[in-house]
Amino acid sequence: MAAAVAAAGRLGWLFAALCLGNAAGEAAPGPRVLGFCLEEDGAAGAGWVRGGAARDTPDATFLLRLFGPGFANSSWSWVAPEGAGCREEAASPAGEWRALLRLRLRAEAVRPHSALLAVRVEPGGGAAEEAAPPWALGLGAAGLLALAALARGLQLSALALAPAEVQVLRESGSEAERAAARRLEPARRWAGCALGALLLLASLAQAALAVLLYRAAGQRAVPAVLGSAGLVFLVGEVVPAAVSGRWTLALAPRALGLSRLAVLLTLPVALPVGQLLELAARPGRLRERVLELARGGGDPYSDLSKGVLRCRTVEDVLTPLEDCFMLDASTVLDFGVLASIMQSGHTRIPVYEEERSNIVDMLYLKDLAFVDPEDCTPLSTITRFYNHPLHFVFNDTKLDAVLEEFKRGKSHLAIVQKVNNEGEGDPFYEVLGLVTLEDVIEEIIRSEILDESEDYRDTVVKRKPASLMAPLKRKEEFSLFKVSDDEYKVTISPQLLLATQRFLSREVDVFSPLRISEKVLLHLLKHPSVNQEVRFDESNRLATHHYLYQRSQPVDYFILILQGRVEVEIGKEGLKFENGAFTYYGVSALTVPSSVHQSPVSSLQPIRHDLQPDPGDGTHSSAYCPDYTVRALSDLQLIKVTRLQYLNALLATRAQNLPQSPENTDLQVIPGSQTRLLGEKTTTAAGSSHSRPGVPVEGSPGRNPGV
C-alpha cells in the first residue's frame, strides 16, 4: 500500500486562463475550473482525499466533479503530467456550472509526480463560434481602409497648398484657379486643427484595421501585420497620393466640408494638436527658405553647375596664345595702334617682350583714356605707370577654383601656364594661352557669349549660339581714318577727320548716307582741295581772303568750320554775331535745282543724262547768292566742298549702288579716279567761276545750327 501510495500521483488544481479575454471578464468568457471533488461510483480503489489532495494508485480510474462557469459549451477538460500534451478525456457537462471527468492515471512514471488539471476550447467551438461572420469582417476592414484613405486624401488635397501658394494663385492664376484659391484661403486659418484631426482619424483607422485582421486571421500575428501593412500602403497611401497629386486644385475646395466634419468629430484632441502644430511652424521659416533659395543653397542647378566646373580644367576652355590679341612692349600708341585696340573689342590686353609667350604686363582699355594719338606715347610708359598685376594659373586647375579666384576680384583674365619638363635641361614654365571670366561663364551656361564688340561671322565659337533675331551691326572700321603713306598728305588729324565724317553724315542732310556713302564721303574729305586753311592777317583785318561769303555774291561751295572763329553779318540791318567750330554755311549752294539732285540717290535705273553733270553747273544761272557775310576773325581750318565735287560724290555713290550690267559699265568708278575727277572738275570750275577764291558759306544762316 505504501508503494502504491508512493507511486500515486498528486492531483493539484489550477486555474487556466483562456485566450479570449478570460482574465479581463469579456462578455462571453471561456470555461474556468473553480474546484473539484471525488465522486464515489462504487468501484473498488476509487481513491481518497487527504490533506486537500486526491490520491490513487497507478492505473486506477476515478471520477472527478468539476465546478466552474462555461462547462455548457463544447469545452472539455483533461489531466496530464507537466509538459505532456493534451489528452482525449472529455468531461460530461452536468449543467452550466458542473461537469464530470473520468480519469485514469497511467503507470509510466516510477516516482510520484504532479498532474495538472486544465480546460481546452476546441477549434471551431466555444468563443470561436461566437466570432463575427466573414462578411462582417470584410465590410469592417473595407470601411476602416476607406476611412484611412479618405483622411490621407484630405490631408494631401485640402492642406497641400501653402498660404503663399494660395495667394499666388488668387492673384495671378486663371479664373478657375482664382475661384478655388478664394475658397481655400479661409480654410488655411484652421489648417493646424484640420491636420491634427485627419492624422488622428487615419491612425485610429489603421490601428483598428490591424486588430480586425488579427481576429480574421485566427489570432495569428504575422498574416495580420503583413496584410494590414500592404492594404494601408496601397489603398491608404499610394492611391490618395496619386489622385490628389493630379487633381489637387479641383479636389481641395470640394473636400473642405469633410475636413470640417473631421475637426468636429475629433475637436477635443484636434484643437490642442493643431495649436501645437501651428506653434512648431515658425512664421520666419518661409522668409528663411526664400533667402536660402536666393543664396543658391536650395537651387539644384547650383550644385549641377559646380559639378560641371569640377570636371573641367582650364586647359579645356582657354584661348590659345596664337589666337590672342597682344601688343609688343615697344609699340608706340599712335592712331593706328589705338584703332586696332578699339577694333579688337578687348578691355584687357597682354603686353609681351620679344616673343608672345613672354608676357610681362597687362594693358587695360581704360588706361588709354588720357592718351593722345598725336603724342605717340610709348606703350611701356603707360604699363609702367599703372603696373597692373599679372594672374597666372596652371593648366590643370579646375574651373571652380578659377571662378573663386575671379570672384575675389583679383582679375578677370588669367595667363595659363604649365611646367614643361620634356627633353633635356631644367623644367620651365610654358605659356599656353589666356582664360577669362567669360570663358568660365560660357562653360556654365553651355553656350557662346557674343558681346556688342563681336561679330559671329568673324568669331570662331566653340558651340553654335542661339539664332539672332536682329542683324548684327557693322563693326566700326577705324582704320579707314588713318592716312596711309601713299595717300595725299592732308593737314587734318585722324581724330578730327573721324569727327568731321560723323558730323556731316549725321547732322547735314545733304551728306547723309542715303545720298553719299560713308566711304565716298571719307574719300572726299581726304582730298587736298577740300581741306583748306585761312591765315588771318592781324595788320589787315578786312583783307579780301578773310571773307568766306559776301552778301549777294554768287558762290557754289559749302563750308564747314573745323577750327577758328568767324563773324556773320545778316540782312540789311547788319546783325552781327560770332560762330566757332562745326558751324557750316552754303548748304543751298549744293542743293540748287539740277538734274542730278532731282533724281533719287537710291534709284537703281537712272536715266543716262541724269547722271552726267552739266558743264554749266558752275555758271551764274545755277549759282547761289547768300544774304549774309562771313568773315574770319582768326586762323581757320575748314572743309570746302564745291558743287562739282558734291556731284561727283553723288555719282560715285550711285555707281556703287547700281548692279553690275553692260548698261552701267560707264558708271563704274575706278579706284583712285574719284580723286582725279574731283581735282579736274575743281580746276575747270576755278577758271570759269566768278566767286572769290577764298572760303564759302551757307545759303541761309538760319539753317545753320550755330547761327
Curated annotation (Swiss-Prot):
Residues 678-707 are annotated as: Disordered. SUPFAM superfamilies: CBS-domain pair. Residues 678-691 have a biased composition (Polar residues). The gene is CNNM3. InterPro entries: ACDP (IPR045095), CBS_dom (IPR000644), CBS_dom_sf (IPR046342), CNNM (IPR002550), Ion_transp-like_CBS (IPR044751). Widely expressed. Expressed at higher level in heart and spleen. Pfam families: CBS. It comes from the Eukaryota. Shares weak sequence similarity with the cyclin family, hence its name. However, it has no cyclin-like function in vivo. Keywords: CBS domain, Cell membrane, Glycoprotein, Ion transport, Membrane, Phosphoprotein, Repeat, Transmembrane, Transmembrane helix, Transport. One of its GO terms (cellular component) is membrane. Residues 318-379, 386-452 form the CBS domain. Belongs to the ACDP family. Probable metal transporter. Glycans are attached at N73. Its main location: membrane. This is Metal transporter CNNM3. The modification Phosphoserine is found at S661, S700. It is a multi-pass membrane protein. It is found in: Cell membrane. Residues 130-308 form the CNNM transmembrane domain. GO terms for biological process: magnesium ion homeostasis; monoatomic ion transport. GO terms for molecular function: transmembrane transporter activity.
